[in-house]
């Protein structure tokens, strides 16, 4: 008889980035919450409008963004582009997110 072995690898250090959040003050999903971002304290997050205007930037992001732009006002409902750079992983993640109030 033959023995077959399977190995399953789990990675618990992968950040999970949502594609939407609702910063409406109800206490649910009010910030752009990136799971496991605390494993990468040396990170940079940039958020842009669809036209390419930078509206938010943080070095050492800690899930604090609640849809407030650089002007101190709530950004309009809609799609935004993010760039998250993780120094430790030497990786950049990019994508779209939707803000809904």
Segments and roles (model prediction):
Residues 5-101:
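Short loop/turn motifs at secondary-structure boundaries
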């Amino acid at each position: 008889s033959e023995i077959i072995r399977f190995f399953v690898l789990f990675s618990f250090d992968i950040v999970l980035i949502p594609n939407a959040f609702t910063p409406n003050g109800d206490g649910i999903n009010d910030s752009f919450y990136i799971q496991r971002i605390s494993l990468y304290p040396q990170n940079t997050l940039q958020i842009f409008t669809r036209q390419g205007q930078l509206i938010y930037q943080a070095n050492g992001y800690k899930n604090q963004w609640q849809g407030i732009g650089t002007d101190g006002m709530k950004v309009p409902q809609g799609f935004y582009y993010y760039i998250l750079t993780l120094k430790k992983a030497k990786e950049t993640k990019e994508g779209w997110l939707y803000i809904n109030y």
